[in-house]
């Protein structure tokens, strides 16, 4: 662990570089185009279907 005390700044530079690179890549994402081309999620299997009829919640009027 002695090398960590000597070369901590190199590790810090690598981490800062990774964060800056990630920010640059996230800026390139076109959110509107992504949301327009997003695939539909398939319906999920409801494992609680047999208990759905036994709800204790009050009915909405």
Swiss-Prot record:
Family annotation (InterPro entries): UPF0370
Keywords, ordered alphabetically: Cell membrane, Membrane, Transmembrane, Transmembrane helix
Organism of derivation: Serratia proteamaculans (strain 568)
Membrane topology, as annotated: Single-pass membrane protein
Pfam families (alphabetical): UPF0370
Keyword check for Cell membrane: yes
Ranges for region Disordered: 38-61
Feature: compositional bias, Basic and acidic residues: 38-48
Domain of life according to the entry: Bacteria
Similarity comment text for this entry: Belongs to the UPF0370 family.
Transmembrane intervals: 3-23
Protein's cellular compartments: Cell membrane
Comp. bias (Acidic residues): 49-61
GO cellular component assignments: plasma membrane
Protein name: UPF0370 protein Spro_3503
